[in-house]
Amino acid sequence: MHTVVVGTSGTTADDVIAVARGGARIELSAEAVAALAAARGIVDALAARPEPVYGVSTGFGALASRHISPELRAQLQRNIVRSHAAGMGPRVEREVVRALMFLRLKTVASGHTGVRPEVAQTMADVLNAGITPVVHEYGSLGCSGDLAPLSHCALTLMGEGDAEGPDGIVKPAGELLAAHGIAPVELREKEGLALLNGTDGMLGMLVMALADLQRLYVTADITAALSLEALLGTDKVLAPELHAIRPHPGQAVAAANMSAVLKGSGLVGHFQEEEAPRVQDAYSVRCAPQVAGAGRDTLAHARLVADRELASSVDNPVVLADGRVESNGNFHGAPVAYVLDFLAICAADLGSIAERRTDRLLDKNRSHGLPPFLADDAGVDSGLMIAQYTQAALVSEMKRLAVPASVDSIPSSAMQEDHVSMGWSAARKLRTAVGNLNRILAVELYAATRAIELRRHLTPAPASQAAIGALRAAGVQGPGPDRFLAPDLEAADAFVRDGKLIAAVEPVTGPLA
């Protein structure tokens, strides 16, 4: 099994994916253990001094003015975890919780939080045992970090609350820790606060969304090319020189991907005999590279933000190398929240343009010779009429999900925390949007491949033939009389989600970016 080593200098998106989705094991580097011990020494020295230090010997938030006596400080740290574990609603997905815990461990290991090495090791042990704290949908405002979600994770480290075992069964956390030989942690000064105060949940969801959207943008180039081919469109608009004079990098990549898929097609540029030659195609076909390209460039910006966050140590207060413990505002989730919202907008638009191409394939007045709704016997059969309804419903929801969460803010903690990012909410709606986009592109794929097969007298591009063959091998049926459609659509959705479309096409086209 792959092992991820956690050091003091952050982590990578690949490591987050490996831990969250691949179940990779985690080890703390010797450098991290030394940094943890050094920072803990600073906290212990400050705890012994008479003057108050926020997070070490004071209350929290609006209660920070109270100086806490030494005999109450362990209770203070336990209490902050228990009281902040106030989430409600459905459970958050296992991969999100694993990403959240791993990213918190990454910050703890940086040596800027003052957490003891044994607490960090317990975090790694819990992840390695496949124990997943029960975390709920609601409870984070995205400022002072993802407080409630992280608190539920810290509660598990204490042996309290509920968690899911590696067998998928939810049990009391104390039972699961005991079954795996893990001793619950006894928190000391600052440790409870340090386990709660980070943007790890929203960052984990951003990292996973970026991986999913990279796949979906390549998928969208393929489905756009298939639709162009099925509509007998022209590939002249994909010429590199046209995109060079508007030098957005993502646009050129999208056009190149579409060109590679369409290479060798006998359908491209073929016009029905009764039609005048088309000078240009509809916007949803002709402008596909521009829309997908703009989204790709937004992905690139979001990756830059994610990489910076992955290299960050987010806590308040932080332990500095010169021995100071300083309050700061690095827990504010605005940088992550903004790009999460940007990506939801891009996903909505990519889904919107795909739906417009699908509708064009089904409309006999605009499909250039295809039967109405791609039906076998139109009138007796409805073909893919309602598949487009489903796609349209998904697009409509995508538009609602594109409304930014980060423009909202609601004060909390007696107006001490009077501006928040709502980044967790932005991340949650982006996860829904990513799933919807997958389904939208699956419907376009289903319609476009069916339409190409109905052009029986013309030879599709080799890449298109490979896509159709793989889709049929996956159990998605081709043209024919009406049948129960939902199983085909679900199979197409899984085909796209598992990356099988890209895997089928790339042996013909070469790698698609």
Summary of predicted features, one role per range:
Residues A48-P52, G130-H136, L150, P172, ...:
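Hydrophobic alpha-helical context, especially transmembrane and signal-peptide helices
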Residues M1-A24, L28-A35, A39-A47, S69, ...:
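C-terminal auxiliary extensions adjacent to catalytic cores
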Residues Y54-I68, L72-L76, S83-K106, V134-M158, ...:
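FAD-binding core of FAD-dependent oxidoreductases
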Residues S110-N128, T132, C143-L147, D167-R188:
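Well-ordered mid-protein domain cores that form the structural environment of catalytic cofactors
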